[in-house]
């Protein structure tokens, strides 16, 4: 039979062990999200020579599938880094809500879709976000340029070819969403609880 002191010692060890595990998990996530945020912004910079073709939509969806609500951390670390790198000019402001829109849509997708369905749905959603980018960006542009309704529609029409390129690029790069999210989930499960 154990004495009351032995039970208290075991409880203390258990509390300390749980606290260490939580701190370890927090440090792991902090480092991981900083690296993923840096990769998010670096991918945009690296792909600058290709107009409107980048990994931001793909990474937003991958991070959301893998980390759910916590995906906002690396996404907005990356958005902040893009602002620090290129300056916090007016183009940067819509990035703050454009990523949030795609994150929200991804959060609304069922989590337990069959693999074959995911392989179609994820690239299509990513692509639709690219096709709609100009229309989603337009209200902000109209606001800062003082455009009326007609001016905003003309602005959207003028950028339509770039939105088409953006949507096609997002679809092509969106084909990476399923394998990357599976990789992230597998690696996170393997290394996060050590």
Describe the residue ranges of each PLM region:
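Context-gated lysine
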Residues: 2, 22, 44, 70, ...
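Alpha-helical membrane segments and adjacent membrane-interface helices in multi-pass membrane proteins
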Residues: 37-110
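Membrane-embedded alpha-helical hairpins and interfacial helices in multi-pass inner-membrane proteins
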Residues: 92-94, 115-194
